[in-house]
Amino acid sequence: MKDILLGVNVDHIATLRQARGTSYPDPAHAASVAEHAGADGITIHLREDRRHIQDRDVYVMAKTIQTRMNLETAVTDEMINIALEVKPEYVCLVPEKREELTTEGGLDVAGNLEKITAATKTLSDAGIKVSLFIDADKAQLDAAKATGAPYVEIHTGAYADATTDEAISKELEHIRQGVKYAASIGLIVNAGHGLHYHNVKPIAAMEEIYELNIGHAIIARAAIDGLDKAVRDMKRLMLEARA
């Protein structure tokens, strides 16, 4: 069984910095530590409200990341233009609401097909690999395929939030079927949102998944154990699930 990759999201290093308006901690420094510990890529989300990652972070990390930058953005002219200037390896298009604590659901590709297809083409023409953050629904997966985006990131939030065994099993099966279908129509499948050290293995065990993007759990663990160990422990759990 092939290995699975880990993209470490360092947004919440920036959250800690912005809480006091200081110049530290620096997400670029955190990205370097995460890479040294085995991260296969670094994910950052430049939100329209700039609540954590700032424009400067994006430009600095575009020059300092040694693995791959995955830039999450809303489908807006401002964000697409920033992506075109920065030229990260990957752009993941995500839904965004200013009042949300974190991304609450998947992108409605089926309902915004023309707009998302246009953004995907613009980014792809610039040599950027495009991923769409969507729920594991067949209609959304078909729409994602129609945009020409080569990647999807399956939203695992409902699974992560489930509290009963029945609900967990139901959400896990929903994701499993979505992942298999996405792979069957030629999409490269990533996954993420709400994954942590106690729920990651069943997702990582799905052999069709190429990469998991995980942030909050790793940064939270880093506050206790240090970032190097937090990344290594997550990567170990993921690889154990593939053994």
From Swiss-Prot:
Active-site residues (renumbered): H45, E72, H193
Protein EC: 2.6.99.2
One GO CC term on file: cytosol
Pathway connected to this protein: Cofactor biosynthesis; pyridoxine 5'-phosphate biosynthesis; pyridoxine 5'-phosphate from D-erythrose 4-phosphate: step 5/5
GO annotation (BP), single: pyridoxine biosynthetic process
Ribonucleoprotein among keywords: no
Class of the enzyme per the UniProt entry, highest EC level: transferase
The organism's place on the tree of life at top rank: Bacteria
Reaction(s) the record says it catalyses: 3-amino-2-oxopropyl phosphate + 1-deoxy-D-xylulose 5-phosphate = pyridoxine 5'-phosphate + phosphate + 2 H2O + H(+)
Binding positions (1-deoxy-D-xylulose 5-phosphate): D11, H12, R47, H52, T102
A molecular function GO annotation: pyridoxine 5'-phosphate synthase activity
Localization terms from the record: Cytoplasm
Positions of 3-amino-2-oxopropyl phosphate binding: N9, R20, G194, G215, H216
Record site: Transition state stabilizer: E153
Annotated NCBIfam families: pdxJ (TIGR00559), PRK05265.1-1 (NF003623), PRK05265.1-3 (NF003625), PRK05265.1-5 (NF003627)
Function, as annotated: Catalyzes the complicated ring closure reaction between the two acyclic compounds 1-deoxy-D-xylulose-5-phosphate (DXP) and 3-amino-2-oxopropyl phosphate (1-amino-acetone-3-phosphate or AAP) to form pyridoxine 5'-phosphate (PNP) and inorganic phosphate.
Protein name (database record): Pyridoxine 5'-phosphate synthase
The encoding gene: pdxJ
